[in-house]
Amino acid sequence: TKEASATEADGSTDGDSTAAGGDFSGQISVISREDGSGTRGAFIELFGVEEKNDAGEKVDNTTVDAQITNNTSVMMSTVAGNQYAIGYISLGSLNDEVKALKIDGAEASAENVENGSYKVSRPFNIVTKDGLSADAQDFMDYILSTDGQQVVSDDGYIAIKDTKAYEGSCSGEKVVVAGSSSVTPLMEKLKEAYTK
């Protein structure tokens, strides 16, 4: 089991049509993320798709037949549009368009990641440069506060425990967030809540 403060589940997904008793006779279409995707990196590591070669270098053994998508929403729409497709996304990105597969009988949920019964998870990381401005530090303080972590929890992710109330004050300065297509929707919600 992997433990982290803020965690996402990497839920393998498949389209809903087969779950409702659809046709199971087609060839499975493997849908993967692009090289460099943090979601892909976590998936290949957690599921043993990545191995070391004789030189000790990591090798990604994703099938060459995989259809590559460049972000979470494209992954979801591609899987949803093909009843034979299977792919992977972050649990917090899951919606009614696709469904998550059980792992060892456990449903993909924040509760099951937290209690250890859903064993596939990874941390979300926020990185900054050294010497944050006062405004950027205030936003980070908000993210790590009880208020910010409520946004994290409400969005389906696992919040950091033992947080304190936010005591800063948003200056109204422009907040810019960038990065992974898995993390960006959550960061945008945090930004929106912070700047209210």
Where are the predicted features?
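Exported/periplasmic ABC-transporter solute-binding proteins
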Residues: 1-196
